[in-house]
Amino acid sequence: MSILKVIHDRNAGMMPEVYKELTEEEMAGRILKIKKKFGARLFIPGHHYQKDEVIQFADATGDSLQLAQVAQKNKKAEYIVFCGVHFMAETADMLTSDEQIVVLPDMRAGCSMADMANMRQTNRAWEELTKLFGDTVIPLTYVNSTAEIKAFVGRNGGASVTSSNAARMLTWALSQKERILFLPDQHLGRNTAFDLGIPLSRMAVWDPIAEKLEYNGDMKDIIIILWKGHCSVHEKFTVANIKSVKERDPDINVIVHPECTHEVVALSDFSGSTKKIIDSINEAKPGSKWAIGTEMNLVSRIIQEHPDKQIESLNPDMCPCLTMNRIDMPHLLWSLEQIDKGEPTGVIKVDQDIAKDAILALNRMLTIR
């Protein structure tokens, strides 16, 4: 099955309505029964942004790459039920064996940021950038991207990046070529490049809709070309949010994810990956005060886990990631019962040609220290 077939089948095999009528107790009992029956043959990774009702059944929690790597090391599992979004399940499929079956409980669980860069747009951008800059551009893609985009990057000598290793990967990329095309999240690219000492005046933005480069200046000065994409959740944190919490309590620590805008990151006390945010709160002194700028399910979980600290969301009106939230207890149960019947649905299988090139991008990242 090609990756395009997988994407087009997102609405196939919809969960029967009867699952929504079950009580949480009924669903939990049936989920645990299947987990016990399958034992090590079943592995459920759960992303940090998942609801508590799902995370309680996860065999491992982490960010997208951590979970894919954990799945890769798990040679016993016949079925990997990935509680995350589509691109995460794709990465897990590419890093696991052909015999292992990766399942996404709800095929509608996509990622708006990953969908902001498709192959038609990327090929068009590459064509124009090559005309402008010749062979001086290397592509990097955030792991929050489709398998096809990772494959494009791999074919063209680039690598994938995470929010944890973005600085290291940009440094490596600039040792390879004069310029970087950073996909699909402009904010992570901009914040990371700025931290490395690259001024905003040397960063341009590629608009895939208008198919043009946004830059006021001499083209030869451009070092970073940022794809005009963003995370719909993290872009909602604002400078006004920071000013509001600081005016209310000057002692509060503001920590945000680098997918937030540059203005928000610049005004925050700390910024970093999901892991850095979690570690920072874990290591903070009792009684310390924190306003966190990241996904609401994770913030709520951190608040519950640290009653000795004063923690709140930087934006009190923030909603959880809507696509991540498509994975819920009814969909998890349905997915597991389909596996139990021998009729798994929501199977993610990346075309081998795409996987081969995408793995190049992933492996380059994993080997660069």
UniProtKB/Swiss-Prot annotation:
EC no.?
A: 2.5.1.72
GO CC terms for this protein? cytosol
Reaction catalysed? iminosuccinate + dihydroxyacetone phosphate = quinolinate + phosphate + 2 H2O + H(+)
Q: Where in the cell is it found?
A: Cytoplasm
Cofactor descriptive note:
Binds 1 [4Fe-4S] cluster per subunit.
Q: Name one GO molecular function term.
A: metal ion binding
Which cofactors are required for activity? [4Fe-4S] cluster
Q: Which domain of life is it from?
A: Bacteria
**Which Gene Ontology BP terms does the record give?**
'de novo' NAD biosynthetic process from L-aspartate
Q: Where does [4Fe-4S] cluster bind?
A: 111, 231, 321
InterPro entries of this UniProt entry? Answer: NadA, NadA_sf, Quinolinate_synth_A_type3
Q: In which pathway does it act?
A: Cofactor biosynthesis; NAD(+) biosynthesis; quinolinate from iminoaspartate: step 1/1
UniProt keywords, alphabetically: 4Fe-4S, Cytoplasm, Iron, Iron-sulfur, Metal-binding, Pyridine nucleotide biosynthesis, Transferase
Residues that hold iminosuccinate according to the record: 47, 64, 142-144, 163, 257-259, 274
Protein family membership: Belongs to the quinolinate synthase family. Type 3 subfamily.
* Protein function: Catalyzes the condensation of iminoaspartate with dihydroxyacetone phosphate to form quinolinate.
Q: What is this protein called?
A: Quinolinate synthase
Q: Which gene encodes it?
A: nadA
